[in-house]
């Protein structure tokens, strides 16, 4: 059986996922498209899914009997509405981050999924599928001993004028918030944000770089450098210091050169190139589970925890270096 997918939101990531499903992965095809700008949906249909129908109403797409599962790739403010509609229709749903723009909205999705009695939602935290992070998690389990500290960095070449200080948390750090919690299998209990001297490349309304310090329930201390105007490349670093050793995220594969008395290796400039395989792996996981009428991978609960943690980090940006508590309710049995 070929799984029929409906894609809501055909901007850059929606079009890329449509291409991925129809041209790279097996067992599914994109059967329906929707975008607030119909021209985007028509372009996606023309370039990647000529047999797909275009829906002007996203809710009609979700309800359609010829659509088996949903991809929500639209503007973040709409995610909660469409994910809740997919749950109500009993259809597996892959939602790009954020699951919702507020912790309260993410909690409503968790509650709806609990009421449905089974997992239907996968959140697009693709780093869990990156081979480097998978190997790092294995090293933590088998080599380093219990984690003590984590040093991490998320560096972008540059950002636009519309990128503001809180976006360093909600748009950038959010990936570390999820993947570090997954690596450590530990929840956060507190967050602090420190601001070093401001980079002259940062625009007036952006404080950059930032250092976010997270503490976990087991006492692990994590420092994450967020530097979104580093200019030299897209650079993701992660080092876990354990009781018995240290494990470090490997660099992306690249040709090493020796020339002119210089040992060199290129640094990627684009996040899509850094994690291109991870997107294939995460969607393949979703399609495999959706064919069984369920969901796999990062859960709605993971999306909720990320939202609560991000809110605390944004509050910590205004707390003058003081720690802000991160408080979570008990994890529902559905996500145990």
From Swiss-Prot:
One of its GO terms (biological process) is inositol catabolic process. Transmembrane segments: none annotated. It catalyses: myo-inositol + NAD(+) = scyllo-inosose + NADH + H(+). The keyword Oxidoreductase applies. It comes from the Bacteria. Its EC number is 1.1.1.18. It holds the Pfam family GFO_IDH_MocA_C. GO terms for molecular function: inositol 2-dehydrogenase (NAD+) activity; nucleotide binding. Keywords: NAD, Oxidoreductase. SUPFAM superfamilies: Glyceraldehyde-3-phosphate dehydrogenase-like, C-terminal domain, NAD(P)-binding Rossmann-fold domains. Belongs to the Gfo/Idh/MocA family. Homotetramer. Involved in the oxidation of myo-inositol (MI) to 2-keto-myo-inositol (2KMI or 2-inosose). This is Inositol 2-dehydrogenase. The gene is iolG.
